[in-house]
C-alpha cells in the first residue's frame, strides 16, 4: 500500500510539471533579473515547489556564497588630455568609463562602466524599456561623428533594477546592466572606481560628466561635457527649496548657481578624486532635480556608497578592479 501511494504522488508531480502555462513576453513585461526570476518561479515552478515541500529544498550551491573578488586591473584612471571645465567639452575620452545608453537608436541616458561586464545607471533610465532595444556605447566622445574614437557598442543581456525604486520619490534610483559581451580595457575604455563604504563626499568638489543639455530647454550636447559642482551635506540639501522629506539619506545634492547637471545627464556619473588629481571614484548617479542650475534647487544624485552591498550581491558572476 505505501508503495502505491508513492507511485501516485510521483505521477502527480510529473503531471503538474508538464502542465502548459501561458507564455509571457519577458522583454515587454519585465525590467529586472529579479522580476524575471520571480516570474519563472511563478509560471514554471509549481511542481518543483510541491516536490520541495515534501522532500526538502536543495542546498545552495557553494559558488553562490562566494564574495565578489578583485580583478587584476586598475580603476578610475583618467586620460591626460588637456582639461576644460565649467560646462565646457572634456578632452577626448578623458573619462574612459563614461557610457551612453541608446534606446531604439536614440540617445537616452548616461551610465558608467564599473568592470568589463557591467555598467551602472539610474533605475528611472531603464523603466519600461525593452532590453532588446538598449545599446551601451563606450569610448565615445562626439555623438555626431561616426568612429571619432575607438568606441565599442554592446547589447544588454540583463537588467537589475533596485527592487525598491520609487517612481514618485526617485529613492533607490540605481540599476545595473550586464553587457552581452565583455569589453576589453584600453585607453578609451576603462572602469571607474566605486567609493569606499565610509566616504562622505560632502564639502568636496565633484565632477559631472555627460551629454546632457548645456542649458534648461536647450539641445543635447554633441560632445561629452563636464562641470564641477560643490557637494552639499544632507542638512544643506534639506535646507534648500526642496521639501526636506524629498531628500533621503540615499541621495546626494550638488550644484550651485549655473553649475549643475541637466536633462540628458540622467544615469551619468558624479565623480570625486580622493587619491590624487587623476584617479576618480563614482560617488553619485545623476537622478533628478528641478530645472537646470536654478537657484535653490541643486541637482540630486543617488548616493552610490549606500548601495555597495547591493552592487556586489548582483555582480557575483564577475569581479571588480582594485581601488
Describe each PLM feature range:
Residues 77-81, 101-102, 119-122, 127-164, ...:
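Conserved H-D interstitial segment of serine endopeptidase catalytic domains
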Residues 64-72, 77-79, 144-146, 152-154, ...:
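Chymotrypsin/trypsin-fold serine protease catalytic domain
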Residues 94-98, 108-120, 132, 152-158, ...:
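Extracellular regions of mammalian proteins, primarily the fibronectin type-III
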Residues 124-127, 140-144, 180-185, 212-215, ...:
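Acidic glycine-/aspartate-rich tracts in secreted/extracellular proteins
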Residues 2-115, 119-120, 135, 139-140, ...:
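Protease-domain processing segments flanking chymotrypsin-fold serine proteases, especially trypsin-like
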Residues 2-24, 114-119, 123, 226-232, ...:
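C-terminal subregion of chymotrypsin/trypsin-like serine protease catalytic domains
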Residues 86-92, 164-169, 217-220, 295-298:
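Conserved, non-catalytic sequence blocks in retroelement Pol enzymes and Pol-derived host proteins
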Residues 70-76, 110, 124-126, 236-238, ...:
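Sequence contexts marking disulfide-bonded cysteines in secreted/extracellular proteins
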Amino acid at each position: 500500500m505505501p508503495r502505491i501511494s508513492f507511485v501516485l504522488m510521483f505521477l502527480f508531480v510529473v503531471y503538474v510539471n508538464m502542465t502548459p502555462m501561458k507564455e509571457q513576453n519577458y522583454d515587454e513585461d519585465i525590467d529586472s533579473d529579479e522580476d524575471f526570476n520571480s516570474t519563472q518561479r511563478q509560471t514554471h515552478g509549481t511542481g518543483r515547489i510541491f516536490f520541495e515541500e515534501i522532500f526538502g529544498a536543495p542546498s545552495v550551491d557553494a559558488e553562490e556564497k562566494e564574495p565578489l573578488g578583485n580583478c587584476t586591473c586598475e580603476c578610475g584612471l583618467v586620460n591626460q588630455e588637456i582639461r576644460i571645465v565649467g560646462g565646457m567639452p572634456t578632452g577626448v575620452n578623458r573619462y574612459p568609463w563614461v557610457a551612453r545608453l541608446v534606446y531604439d537608436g536614440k540617445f537616452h541616458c548616461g551610465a558608467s562602466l564599473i568592470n568589463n561586464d557591467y555598467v551602472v545607471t539610474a533605475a528611472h533610465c531603464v523603466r519600461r524599456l525593452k532590453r532588446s532595444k538598449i545599446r551601451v556605447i563606450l569610448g565615445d566622445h562626439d555623438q555626431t561623428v561616426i568612429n571619432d574614437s575607438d568606441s565599442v557598442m554592446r547589447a544588454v543581456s540583463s537588467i537589475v533594477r533596485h527592487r525598491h525604486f520609487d517612481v514618485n520619490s526617485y529613492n533607490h534610483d540605481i540599476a545595473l546592466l550586464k553587457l552581452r559581451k565583455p569589453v576589453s580595457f584600453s585607453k578609451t575604455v576603462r572602469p571607474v572606481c566605486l567609493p569606499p563604504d565610509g566616504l562622505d563626499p560632502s564639502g568636496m568638489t565633484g565632477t559631472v560628466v555627460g551629454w546632457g543639455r548645456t542649458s534648461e530647454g536647450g539641445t543635447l550636447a554633441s560632445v561629452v561635457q563636464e562641470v564641477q559642482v560643490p557637494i552639499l551635506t544632507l542638512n544643506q540639501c534639506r535646507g534648500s527649496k526642496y521639501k526636506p522629506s524629498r531628500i533621503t539619506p540615499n541621495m546626494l545634492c550638488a550644484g550651485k548657481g549655473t553649475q549643475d547637471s541637466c536633462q540628458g545627464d540622467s544615469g551619468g556619473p558624479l565623480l570625486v578624486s580622493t587619491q590624487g588629481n587623476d584617479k576618480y571614484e563614482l560617488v553619485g548617479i545623476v537622478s533628478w532635480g528641478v530645472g537646470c542650475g536654478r537657484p535653490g534647487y541643486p541637482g540630486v544624485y543617488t548616493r552610490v556608497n549606500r548601495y555597495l552591498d547591493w552592487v556586489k550581491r548582483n555582480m557575483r558572476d564577475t569581479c571588480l578592479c582594485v581601488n
